[in-house]
């Protein structure tokens, strides 16, 4: 993963002037020791400045964490805390921030050793609101050193995603395909969440591709593809063109990222791509996504934005799939019913033509795009990476500016079942509790497109917090609600 941030969280303790400063300082030291004992000490930095009711201390702490290379901040209330200067620190720190508070350690020290940070967190939240400052506050933000170490560690993937978004450029090629309004992408919300976008024509990409013909690096890329594919290299004749295309994209990224640190690509793949380029780009998309540079299909700008968020959160390859087809009843009865605790309507197949990273596919093979080959010569549709998706935990999610130009998101945890799909493409049998109701009352009701991002693991907790942090209204962050919790649009008589 070479396209995601490495985070360093500066821990700044704060203290109310009528409380012992030593209480905050000693608790900060205990917190830092606890983190180093449980996690990677390189994730954090202990700021030696304790802010005590002083805007001057605030400036000193701010300059110190900047000088230490911190790109995220933890304001630690070691006692009640100075509500003005602690929130000013958050205001002036340019990066993701969180607030946590110290719990009282023992019943034997509740006179001089009582810090009242439980109370101070309330005033901190009030002051954050007064100054319109966004910050991550854990579900229960008060704890001892071990508890707070865990909270900071849980903040890491959230901070990675937020910092990544604020330094991301999406590069797109071409408008979405004809008759494909579902990938409509109102760009205003991209800017609202801190993302830049560079929109190019497909012709620009084609010109750059042609200029890479005969590039001296192509043979080495072909060898790398051959190593990756192994026995799945069923289309060796197309690898040279695919390598040429991969180098085209990578060079474009290097030349066009500008002042941004991270890049994601929304690429075109039909209808003219195959006939002009002479292949489909699915395999190249999968390779770049596996390195942390997500490449979406069908110029899905919010799809690749979602993929990038998942890459930052999981530090792993993700994919983008169609919420594609139902599981046949005979397949459900034969392979799922009685073996797994899912209803038939909890299951569906997630599919795309061949864009999923080889590490996430069972026995991956290079093939051709069967759907396109129904109307085109097979030789111009080569380039898909196909196979059943590896079974295991997944999170299906998406951030989207919908048709009304509002920003919404959904998150649903589930799994890919170890059930043979008996089909083609990058495909898997997915199971999500109460998927049928979620499909109707979230995906359909709120006008989501058919593409969903997939992270390989359960990352719902972090993704939910990322969406909250970047300003998605909480009423528009949906999940697969249990049967005991009806959706607002759900018919109570069904």
Regions found by a protein language model. Name each.
Residues 57-70, 87-89, 248-258:
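Short, well-structured alpha-helical segments in soluble
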Residues 222-313:
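Long, internal scaffold/assembly segments composed of regular secondary structure
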Residues 88-115, 122-127, 286-299:
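Short, acidic/small-residue loops that bind anionic groups at enzyme active sites
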Residues 70-79, 98-100, 262-267:
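Periplasmic-binding protein-like
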Residues 289-422:
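C-terminal catalytic subdomain
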Residues 2-9, 43, 105-233:
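Cap/lid and interdomain-hinge subdomains that line or gate substrate/regulatory clefts
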Residues 1-37:
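N-terminal basic/disordered segments at the start of proteins
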Residues 370-494:
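Extended hydrophobic packing segments that form well-structured cores
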